Regions:
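Activation segment signature within eukaryotic-like protein kinase domains
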Residues: 119-120
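AlphaC helix of the eukaryotic protein kinase fold
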Residues: 45-70
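Protein kinase catalytic-loop region centered on the HRD/HxD motif
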Residues: 123-135
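Activation-segment/catalytic-loop signature of the eukaryotic protein kinase fold
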Residues: 82
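Protein kinase glycine-rich loop
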Residues: 15-23, 27
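Conserved short submotifs of the Hanks-type protein kinase catalytic core
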Residues: 86-100, 104
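C-terminal lobe helix-coil module of Hanks-type protein kinase domains
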Residues: 180-265
Length: 265
Protein backbone atom coordinates (compact mmCIF):
# COMPACT_ATOMS: atom_id res chain seq x y z
CA UNK A 1 0.00 0.00 0.00
CA UNK A 2 1.59 3.24 -1.19
CA UNK A 3 -0.17 5.87 0.88
CA UNK A 4 -1.23 4.94 4.41
CA UNK A 5 -4.31 6.56 5.89
CA UNK A 6 -3.57 9.89 7.52
CA UNK A 7 -0.56 10.53 5.27
CA UNK A 8 -0.43 14.08 3.91
CA UNK A 9 0.73 14.38 0.30
CA UNK A 10 2.48 17.58 -0.82
CA UNK A 11 1.49 19.18 2.48
CA UNK A 12 -2.04 19.46 1.19
CA UNK A 13 -3.91 16.20 0.55
CA UNK A 14 -4.66 14.04 3.59
CA UNK A 15 -5.37 10.42 2.67
CA UNK A 16 -8.60 9.11 4.22
CA UNK A 17 -9.00 5.63 2.73
CA UNK A 18 -8.23 3.45 -0.26
CA UNK A 19 -11.11 3.27 -2.74
CA UNK A 20 -9.84 0.98 -5.49
CA UNK A 21 -6.87 -0.90 -6.86
CA UNK A 22 -6.47 -1.11 -10.60
CA UNK A 23 -3.88 -2.41 -13.02
CA UNK A 24 -2.34 1.00 -13.49
CA UNK A 25 -3.13 2.88 -10.31
CA UNK A 26 -4.50 2.88 -6.79
CA UNK A 27 -7.23 5.38 -5.96
CA UNK A 28 -7.66 6.99 -2.55
CA UNK A 29 -10.25 9.23 -1.00
CA UNK A 30 -8.52 12.26 0.48
CA UNK A 31 -9.22 15.72 1.84
CA UNK A 32 -7.71 18.78 0.21
CA UNK A 33 -6.85 20.61 3.43
CA UNK A 34 -6.25 23.89 1.63
CA UNK A 35 -9.76 24.03 0.16
CA UNK A 36 -11.47 21.78 2.68
CA UNK A 37 -13.03 19.49 0.10
CA UNK A 38 -13.03 15.74 -0.48
CA UNK A 39 -11.06 14.64 -3.55
CA UNK A 40 -9.97 11.41 -5.19
CA UNK A 41 -6.24 10.82 -5.66
CA UNK A 42 -5.09 8.36 -8.27
CA UNK A 43 -1.50 7.26 -7.62
CA UNK A 44 0.04 5.62 -10.68
CA UNK A 45 1.96 2.39 -10.18
CA UNK A 46 5.66 2.98 -10.45
CA UNK A 47 6.46 -0.17 -12.45
CA UNK A 48 4.71 1.40 -15.41
CA UNK A 49 7.67 3.64 -16.08
CA UNK A 50 11.27 2.96 -15.22
CA UNK A 51 14.60 4.17 -16.55
CA UNK A 52 14.64 6.17 -19.78
CA UNK A 53 10.91 5.69 -20.28
CA UNK A 54 10.25 7.41 -16.98
CA UNK A 55 10.68 10.98 -18.27
CA UNK A 56 8.57 10.25 -21.33
CA UNK A 57 5.81 8.80 -19.18
CA UNK A 58 5.83 11.73 -16.75
CA UNK A 59 5.67 14.26 -19.57
CA UNK A 60 2.84 12.39 -21.28
CA UNK A 61 1.00 11.82 -18.01
CA UNK A 62 1.01 15.54 -17.21
CA UNK A 63 0.13 16.49 -20.78
CA UNK A 64 -2.89 14.15 -20.75
CA UNK A 65 -3.92 15.50 -17.34
CA UNK A 66 -3.77 19.07 -18.66
CA UNK A 67 -5.93 18.08 -21.64
CA UNK A 68 -8.48 16.39 -19.37
CA UNK A 69 -8.51 19.39 -17.02
CA UNK A 70 -9.49 21.62 -19.94
CA UNK A 71 -12.77 19.77 -20.57
CA UNK A 72 -15.75 21.32 -18.81
CA UNK A 73 -18.77 19.03 -18.83
CA UNK A 74 -20.96 17.72 -16.00
CA UNK A 75 -20.53 14.19 -17.39
CA UNK A 76 -16.76 14.23 -16.99
CA UNK A 77 -14.84 13.79 -13.74
CA UNK A 78 -12.90 17.01 -13.22
CA UNK A 79 -9.12 16.92 -12.90
CA UNK A 80 -7.80 19.38 -10.28
CA UNK A 81 -4.07 18.80 -9.89
CA UNK A 82 -1.10 16.53 -10.62
CA UNK A 83 2.10 15.91 -8.73
CA UNK A 84 4.64 13.41 -7.50
CA UNK A 85 4.70 11.50 -4.22
CA UNK A 86 7.51 9.12 -3.23
CA UNK A 87 8.59 8.96 -6.88
CA UNK A 88 5.06 8.08 -8.00
CA UNK A 89 2.91 10.31 -10.19
CA UNK A 90 -0.54 11.18 -9.01
CA UNK A 91 -3.69 12.86 -10.23
CA UNK A 92 -6.12 14.75 -8.00
CA UNK A 93 -9.70 14.55 -9.21
CA UNK A 94 -13.25 15.35 -8.25
CA UNK A 95 -14.54 12.78 -5.77
CA UNK A 96 -17.66 11.10 -7.15
CA UNK A 97 -20.11 9.64 -4.64
CA UNK A 98 -21.43 6.55 -6.39
CA UNK A 99 -20.44 3.37 -8.22
CA UNK A 100 -19.14 2.48 -11.65
CA UNK A 101 -21.26 1.02 -14.42
CA UNK A 102 -19.56 -2.37 -14.05
CA UNK A 103 -20.88 -2.57 -10.48
CA UNK A 104 -24.41 -1.76 -11.72
CA UNK A 105 -24.08 -4.35 -14.51
CA UNK A 106 -23.17 -6.98 -11.93
CA UNK A 107 -26.16 -5.96 -9.81
CA UNK A 108 -28.85 -5.95 -12.47
CA UNK A 109 -27.35 -7.88 -15.43
CA UNK A 110 -29.53 -6.17 -18.08
CA UNK A 111 -30.91 -2.64 -18.38
CA UNK A 112 -34.10 -1.33 -19.92
CA UNK A 113 -33.83 0.36 -23.32
CA UNK A 114 -34.78 3.67 -21.68
CA UNK A 115 -32.09 3.43 -18.99
CA UNK A 116 -29.47 2.25 -21.50
CA UNK A 117 -30.20 5.18 -23.81
CA UNK A 118 -30.07 7.64 -20.92
CA UNK A 119 -26.65 6.40 -19.79
CA UNK A 120 -25.38 6.23 -23.38
CA UNK A 121 -26.74 9.74 -24.07
CA UNK A 122 -24.95 11.24 -21.07
CA UNK A 123 -21.74 9.38 -21.99
CA UNK A 124 -21.91 10.72 -25.55
CA UNK A 125 -22.58 14.23 -24.23
CA UNK A 126 -19.38 14.07 -22.15
CA UNK A 127 -17.41 12.62 -25.06
CA UNK A 128 -18.70 15.32 -27.42
CA UNK A 129 -17.16 18.00 -25.15
CA UNK A 130 -13.89 16.08 -24.95
CA UNK A 131 -13.70 15.53 -28.70
CA UNK A 132 -14.38 19.22 -29.33
CA UNK A 133 -11.43 19.96 -27.04
CA UNK A 134 -9.30 17.56 -29.10
CA UNK A 135 -9.21 14.84 -26.43
CA UNK A 136 -9.92 11.19 -27.27
CA UNK A 137 -10.57 8.88 -24.31
CA UNK A 138 -9.19 5.62 -25.85
CA UNK A 139 -10.40 3.38 -23.03
CA UNK A 140 -14.17 3.67 -22.68
CA UNK A 141 -15.45 0.67 -20.70
CA UNK A 142 -17.94 0.18 -17.84
CA UNK A 143 -15.18 0.57 -15.23
CA UNK A 144 -14.52 4.13 -16.45
CA UNK A 145 -18.17 5.19 -16.43
CA UNK A 146 -19.02 6.38 -12.92
CA UNK A 147 -22.65 6.79 -11.85
CA UNK A 148 -22.97 9.43 -9.15
CA UNK A 149 -25.48 9.26 -6.31
CA UNK A 150 -28.12 10.85 -8.55
CA UNK A 151 -27.52 8.15 -11.15
CA UNK A 152 -25.85 10.48 -13.65
CA UNK A 153 -22.80 9.56 -15.72
CA UNK A 154 -19.33 10.93 -15.01
CA UNK A 155 -16.54 9.62 -17.25
CA UNK A 156 -13.13 9.13 -15.68
CA UNK A 157 -9.55 8.33 -16.81
CA UNK A 158 -9.30 10.50 -19.93
CA UNK A 159 -6.03 9.96 -21.75
CA UNK A 160 -4.54 7.72 -19.07
CA UNK A 161 -4.66 4.73 -21.40
CA UNK A 162 -2.51 6.66 -23.85
CA UNK A 163 0.12 7.62 -21.31
CA UNK A 164 0.26 4.10 -19.92
CA UNK A 165 0.09 2.06 -23.13
CA UNK A 166 3.05 3.96 -24.53
CA UNK A 167 5.04 3.42 -21.34
CA UNK A 168 4.48 -0.32 -21.08
CA UNK A 169 5.98 -2.54 -23.69
CA UNK A 170 3.85 -5.51 -22.69
CA UNK A 171 0.43 -3.94 -22.88
CA UNK A 172 -1.22 -7.38 -23.09
CA UNK A 173 -2.34 -7.25 -19.47
CA UNK A 174 -4.02 -3.93 -20.16
CA UNK A 175 -5.54 -5.33 -23.32
CA UNK A 176 -7.22 -8.18 -21.48
CA UNK A 177 -9.72 -6.08 -19.58
CA UNK A 178 -10.24 -3.67 -22.41
CA UNK A 179 -10.16 -5.92 -25.47
CA UNK A 180 -13.92 -6.41 -25.28
CA UNK A 181 -14.48 -2.69 -26.02
CA UNK A 182 -11.59 -1.80 -28.36
CA UNK A 183 -12.34 -0.47 -31.84
CA UNK A 184 -10.82 -2.38 -34.79
CA UNK A 185 -8.63 0.55 -35.94
CA UNK A 186 -7.23 0.86 -32.41
CA UNK A 187 -6.27 -2.81 -32.46
CA UNK A 188 -4.85 -2.83 -35.99
CA UNK A 189 -3.17 0.55 -36.27
CA UNK A 190 -3.12 1.89 -32.70
CA UNK A 191 -5.15 4.71 -34.22
CA UNK A 192 -7.20 6.52 -31.58
CA UNK A 193 -10.15 8.40 -33.05
CA UNK A 194 -13.32 9.99 -31.66
CA UNK A 195 -15.16 7.26 -33.60
CA UNK A 196 -13.19 4.66 -31.64
CA UNK A 197 -14.71 6.05 -28.46
CA UNK A 198 -18.16 5.76 -30.08
CA UNK A 199 -17.50 2.11 -30.96
CA UNK A 200 -16.65 1.39 -27.31
CA UNK A 201 -19.87 3.12 -26.20
CA UNK A 202 -21.81 0.98 -28.69
CA UNK A 203 -20.31 -2.25 -27.33
CA UNK A 204 -21.12 -1.10 -23.81
CA UNK A 205 -24.74 -0.36 -24.79
CA UNK A 206 -24.98 -3.79 -26.45
CA UNK A 207 -23.78 -5.38 -23.21
CA UNK A 208 -26.24 -3.37 -21.09
CA UNK A 209 -29.18 -4.57 -23.18
CA UNK A 210 -28.06 -8.17 -23.74
CA UNK A 211 -26.34 -8.85 -20.42
CA UNK A 212 -23.17 -9.95 -22.22
CA UNK A 213 -20.65 -8.52 -24.69
CA UNK A 214 -21.12 -9.38 -28.38
CA UNK A 215 -17.75 -11.13 -28.69
CA UNK A 216 -16.17 -13.49 -26.19
CA UNK A 217 -13.01 -15.59 -26.33
CA UNK A 218 -10.66 -17.48 -24.02
CA UNK A 219 -7.78 -15.08 -24.62
CA UNK A 220 -7.33 -11.45 -25.68
CA UNK A 221 -5.66 -12.34 -28.99
CA UNK A 222 -8.69 -14.27 -30.25
CA UNK A 223 -11.02 -11.60 -28.92
CA UNK A 224 -9.11 -8.84 -30.68
CA UNK A 225 -9.13 -10.90 -33.89
CA UNK A 226 -12.94 -11.07 -33.76
CA UNK A 227 -13.28 -7.28 -33.39
CA UNK A 228 -11.09 -6.77 -36.44
CA UNK A 229 -12.51 -9.50 -38.68
CA UNK A 230 -16.16 -9.87 -37.71
CA UNK A 231 -19.10 -7.49 -37.67
CA UNK A 232 -20.74 -6.94 -34.31
CA UNK A 233 -23.93 -9.05 -34.45
CA UNK A 234 -27.18 -7.12 -34.61
CA UNK A 235 -28.55 -6.54 -31.09
CA UNK A 236 -31.82 -8.22 -32.21
CA UNK A 237 -29.94 -11.56 -32.21
CA UNK A 238 -29.65 -11.23 -28.42
CA UNK A 239 -32.77 -9.13 -27.74
CA UNK A 240 -35.36 -10.14 -30.37
CA UNK A 241 -38.09 -7.66 -29.41
CA UNK A 242 -35.93 -4.55 -29.48
CA UNK A 243 -36.99 -1.36 -31.27
CA UNK A 244 -35.64 -1.22 -34.86
CA UNK A 245 -34.42 2.37 -34.40
CA UNK A 246 -32.38 1.40 -31.34
CA UNK A 247 -30.92 -1.59 -33.20
CA UNK A 248 -29.95 0.66 -36.14
CA UNK A 249 -28.36 3.20 -33.76
CA UNK A 250 -26.21 0.49 -32.12
CA UNK A 251 -25.27 -0.92 -35.52
CA UNK A 252 -23.96 2.51 -36.55
CA UNK A 253 -21.98 2.98 -33.35
CA UNK A 254 -20.38 -0.46 -33.65
CA UNK A 255 -19.71 -0.43 -37.41
CA UNK A 256 -16.34 -2.04 -38.17
CA UNK A 257 -15.24 0.74 -40.54
CA UNK A 258 -14.55 4.14 -38.95
CA UNK A 259 -16.31 5.97 -41.78
CA UNK A 260 -19.54 4.02 -41.19
CA UNK A 261 -19.86 5.33 -37.63
CA UNK A 262 -21.31 8.75 -36.71
CA UNK A 263 -18.70 11.45 -37.32
CA UNK A 264 -19.08 12.92 -33.85
CA UNK A 265 -20.70 12.19 -30.51
Amino acid sequence: QHAPEGQVIEGRYRVVSRIADGGMATVYQAVDERLGRTVAIKIMHTQLAQGPQRDQFVERFHREARSAAAIANPHIVQVYDTGEFDGLDFLVMEYVHGVNLRYEMNQQVTFSVRETLRIVGETLDGLASAHRAGVVHRDIKPENILLNDRGHVQITDFGLAKAVSQATLSSTGMLLGTAAYLAPEMIQHNQATPQGDLYSVGIMAWEMLAGKVPFTADNPVTLVFKHVHEDVPDITTACPGINAGVAAFLARLTARAVEDRPQDA
